[in-house]
Amino acid sequence: MTFDQSNFKSLIRPVVDFPKPGVVFRDITPLFQSPKATRQVIDSFVQRYIDADFSHIGVMDARGFLIGSVVAYQLNKPLVLFRKQGKLPADVLSEAYQTEYGEAYLEVHADSLCEGNSVIMFDDLIATGGTLIAAANLIRRMGAQVHEAAAIIDLPELGGSKRLNDLNIPTFCLTEFALDEQ
């Protein structure tokens, strides 16, 4: 199946002034309403990572769950959930981080990973990189390492991919948008 970049991008809906004035939110729900586009997303990630040397897939709450869980299933890898504060029932590790909207906390079960594990992190998009950097910090606190950060969308003007790369975390995104791109 050929990856059609322009058709793919047309299925990501821009929502102006959401969740606050001046922000163009990239809504991926139309992408998931297209079985063909969803298959292209999953197949692209599976092909990238099928021969990669890693042990776990970490998924960011909540839209990272949509992609990473299917990729984990396809690659037969354990899934690690990184959740918003207060959503996990057992002992957790917590990490504060800044988003483009304010401060938040990311949590993971404390027994999710151990030394020697290697994780590919999945989210829907990379904006400031705050969520993925918080997840990387949690991964490292458990003695594991980050293999790569993956997302459907990169917003390079917000600098998240650069911040991740500066921390020696490679990134891979299927597409990117300029902030003013409609």
UniProtKB/Swiss-Prot annotation:
UniProt entry tagged with the keyword Protease: no
Primary site of residence: cytoplasm
Annotated EC: 2.4.2.7
GO CC list: cytosol
Xref: InterPro entries: Ade_phspho_trans, Adenine_PRTase, PRibTrfase_dom, PRTase-like
Presence of keyword Nucleotidyltransferase: no
GO molecular function: adenine phosphoribosyltransferase activity
Keywords assigned by UniProt, alphabetized: Cytoplasm, Glycosyltransferase, Purine salvage, Transferase
Pathway involvement of the protein, from the record: Purine metabolism; AMP biosynthesis via salvage pathway; AMP from adenine: step 1/1
Reaction(s) this enzyme catalyzes, per UniProt: AMP + diphosphate = 5-phospho-alpha-D-ribose 1-diphosphate + adenine
Cell compartment(s), UniProt: Cytoplasm
Gene3D superfamilies with a match to the protein in the record: 3.40.50.2020
Top-rank lineage group of the source organism: Bacteria
SUPFAM superfamilies, A to Z: PRTase-like (SSF53271)
Record GO biological process: adenine salvage; AMP salvage; purine ribonucleoside salvage
Family the entry assigns: Belongs to the purine/pyrimidine phosphoribosyltransferase family.
Quaternary structure annotation from Swiss-Prot or TrEMBL: Homodimer.
HAMAP family linked to this entry: Aden_phosphoribosyltr
PANTHER family, A to Z: ADENINE PHOSPHORIBOSYLTRANSFERASE, PHOSPHORIBOSYLTRANSFERASE DOMAIN-CONTAINING PROTEIN
Function: Catalyzes a salvage reaction resulting in the formation of AMP, that is energically less costly than de novo synthesis.
Name of this chain's protein: Adenine phosphoribosyltransferase
Annotated organism of origin: Pseudomonas syringae pv. tomato (strain ATCC BAA-871 / DC3000)
